[in-house]
Each structure stands twice: as structure tokens, then as C-alpha cells.
């Protein structure tokens, strides 16, 4: 194993033990840093002390030529900067060679959401099969509270307060949020809890796979996509779309940007403000369809 690999493994242990990052986040860091290890090795580097800003820029250019998108490249460079900052803190480097290297600005894509009618159709799962009940409960909780996928699969039974209709979730940066989930979600969680022991009860996880283990994020993605097809939705149903839909529908109904920010667990209001653009798109489409002066040729 080279010094390049050794330092990255030390850094990943630091992120896991000291920073307590989630397994999904750790895997993402590992993938990004493996890419720079491969590039550095191809260019004859034996240690990170040999890395300079020119090499980082060449790495960025190579990544773009290989088809890496602007947003993905920004993520890769961010991981690299964080890694080099850590090496500086460990006195392994004198300065961060990636500090002045930035990716081209990524175009900001508006998140896609599911409209209210389609959401009602998606949630209209009335089958007494235990797995269908579990899936309906997961859909209700995700849409009812606007959870991230990692927050949904991380829920334990102890995080529930069904009497008050709330859940506790651990979000990004180990920040805990207490969220209302709505009476429909409560009802379907209770229905699922009546059936949950059929899959085993040793695991603390709220939502179990058919093997009795905590359900995986990949399994949730697969099940949601299948339900989207079964329920006749035209668009692919991804878990994050339910979070986008929650935010959009809440903002359309309340207009309370700060409140939606708190519910979503966004550290910065600017992250939540993207949903105001979605709301404007909705209003603009209504205007174009209904206002006499907006109709072309009239």
C-alpha cells in the first residue's frame, strides 16, 4: 500500500470516528479520493507532499474531459480540499494545493416535484400485504415530514412519539430535528407496527426489510419506483422527489420560507429559496393559462 492510500485511509477513519459521518457520506469521500489517488499514481507521485496546484488543475481538467459534470467536479474538488486541509492540520503538508482551484459553476437545476393529484394517487395504496403496508408508511412519513432518504432509513422505533404525531431525526452534521408527520403517517406507522414482528423484532430500526434487517436506501429507491409505476404515475418516483414535493406544497400553502427551512433542516436559507422559484413557476403557468393578456394571438 502506498503512502497515498495510507493517508486517505487515516483520513477516512478520522471522518468516521471523530466527525461521525454517515456510511453513505464516507463512501462518497472514498470514491472521490480514490479518483485523485489513481491520477496521482499515474503521474508518478509517491506522497501527497509532491502534489501542487498545477497537478490539481490537471486533475480537474482530466475529470471534465472524461465527462464529469460541473456539479460532480465541484463535489470532487471539495472532498480533495477537505482532505488536504486535514493533512495540513496533521503537519503532513505546509499548504493546501487545492485551495485556489475551483470547478466551473454548475447550472442550478430546479428540483422536480410530484403534484398534489399524483401524490394522492401514489399514496392510495390500500393493500393489506405487510410489505405494501410498510411501503405506504414510508411514503407517508417521507412526504409528511419532508425527510431525507438517509433520515428515513435511519429511523428507530424509539424516535417515534405517535401520541404527539412527531418523530426525531438526525440530519446532516448530526443535527437533531423534531418534526410533525401528520395523522395519515401516524395511522400507517401504527398499521405497520402491528405487522412488523412478522419480519423479526431484534433490530431497533422502524422500517425492516423482508429479511428482518434495517431497510437499505437502495431498497427504498427500488420500492418507491415500483409503486410509481403500479399507481400509474408518468414520472419516475425517487425518494428525494417526495422531499421536494413536501417543500413545494408547504411553501405554496403557507409562504413561510423560514418555517420550511426549519422543517427541511437546511443550514442556509438560500438552499430553501430554490423552492420559491418552483412556486413562481407554478404561478406563472397559472397566469399564462388563465390571464387574457397572457394568451398569444388574442
Curated annotation (Swiss-Prot):
Highest taxon of the lineage: Bacteria
GO MF term set: DNA binding; tyrosine-based site-specific recombinase activity
InterPro entries: CB, DNA_brk_join_enz, Integrase-like_cat_sf, Integrase_catalytic, Integrase_recombinase_N, Integrase_SAM-like_N, Recomb_XerC, Tyrosine_recombinase_XerC/XerD
One Pfam family recorded for the sequence: Phage_int_SAM_1
Disulfide linkage: none
Domain Core-binding (CB), residue spans: 2-88
Location of the protein in the cell: Cytoplasm
Main location as per UniProt: cytoplasm
Domain Tyr recombinase positions: 109-288
DNA-binding keyword on record: yes
Regulation: FtsK may regulate the catalytic switch between XerC and XerD in the heterotetrameric complex during the two steps of the recombination process.
Example GO biological process: cell division
Entry GO CC: cytoplasm
Keywords: Cell cycle, Cell division, Chromosome partition, Cytoplasm, DNA integration, DNA recombination, DNA-binding
CDD domains (UniProt xref): INT_XerDC_C
Active site: residue positions: 148, 172, 240, 243, 266, 275
The protein's role, per its UniProt record: Site-specific tyrosine recombinase, which acts by catalyzing the cutting and rejoining of the recombining DNA molecules. Binds cooperatively to specific DNA consensus sequences that are separated from XerD binding sites by a short central region, forming the heterotetrameric XerC-XerD complex that recombines DNA substrates. The complex is essential to convert dimers of the bacterial chromosome into monomers to permit their segregation at cell division. It also contributes to the segregational stability of plasmids. In the complex XerC specifically exchanges the top DNA strands.
Database matches in PANTHER family: PHAGE INTEGRASE-RELATED, TYROSINE RECOMBINASE XERC
Binding partners and assembly: Forms a cyclic heterotetrameric complex composed of two molecules of XerC and two molecules of XerD, in which XerC interacts with XerD via its C-terminal region, XerD interacts with XerC via its C-terminal region and so on.
Similarity comment text for this entry: Belongs to the 'phage' integrase family. XerC subfamily.
Protein name in UniProt: Tyrosine recombinase XerC
Species whose genome carries this gene: Shigella flexneri serotype 5b (strain 8401)
Lineage start: Bacteria, Pseudomonadati, Pseudomonadota, Gammaproteobacteria, Enterobacterales
